[in-house]
Amino acid sequence: MAGISALGVGAKMPLGETLMQLEAAENKRLEPLDKQMKSYDAQITAYGKIRSQLDKLQKASEELKKFDKIVATKVDDEFDAFKVTTDGKASIGNYTVSVTELAHAQTLKSKAVSDIKDPIGETLGEGKTRTLVITQKGEKEPLKIELTDSQTSIIELRDAINKKEGNVSATIVKAQDGVNHLVLTSRKEGTDSQMEITVEGDSKL
């Protein structure tokens, strides 16, 4: 075909030199495209970094909304006698705690009884029971004890209460005048162990 010249044997131009010139020309033509590709790569990398920072900022913003989780202060020391906690509203500083009164276990006693084996409740009849309920604020459930007619003496009450192994212990104390009292004592100290005693089904006990 006209206009087409052959390279190689029979041609007067050096083949190697011609190929190098063609390659150089092609590389020069591709230089702008190569620069543009590098520019695109740099932009994509920059976008990725910006996106990563935005994700971190969004996560931090969501955490800032949860003010109840932000605590600006903390307690440095621990104490055996009491527990100290702080929150975000506490002012930074040193504090002194003075104990003016120690917590103690509550003790209750029954009315005086001459014979510890005498029933002090009503006679309900065979098969019927009454329920002794001891409520303490610090306990999840009140202590409930079902009692038959034969279990209303203070010695039987003592045994029934102790058998439950709750936060209340029962003992019998003999006074100087010879009378006896059923004494109930909370096993734990503090106001949460204060006892409230009621009897369901027996107005006399």
UniProtKB/Swiss-Prot annotation:
It comes from the Bacteria. InterPro entries: Flagellin_hook_IN_motif (IPR010810), FliD (IPR040026), FliD_N (IPR003481). Its main location: secreted. One of its GO terms (biological process) is bacterial-type flagellum-dependent cell motility. Pfam families: Flagellin_IN, FliD_N. Coiled coil: none annotated. Keywords: Bacterial flagellum, Secreted. The keyword Secreted applies. It is found in: Secreted; Bacterial flagellum. One of its GO terms (cellular component) is bacterial-type flagellum hook. The keyword Secreted applies. Disulfide bonds: none annotated. Homopentamer. Belongs to the FliD family. Required for the morphogenesis and for the elongation of the flagellar filament by facilitating polymerization of the flagellin monomers at the tip of growing filament. Forms a capping structure, which prevents flagellin subunits (transported through the central channel of the flagellum) from leaking out without polymerization at the distal end. This is Flagellar hook-associated protein 2. The lineage of its organism: Bacteria, Pseudomonadati, Pseudomonadota, Gammaproteobacteria, Enterobacterales. The gene is fliD.
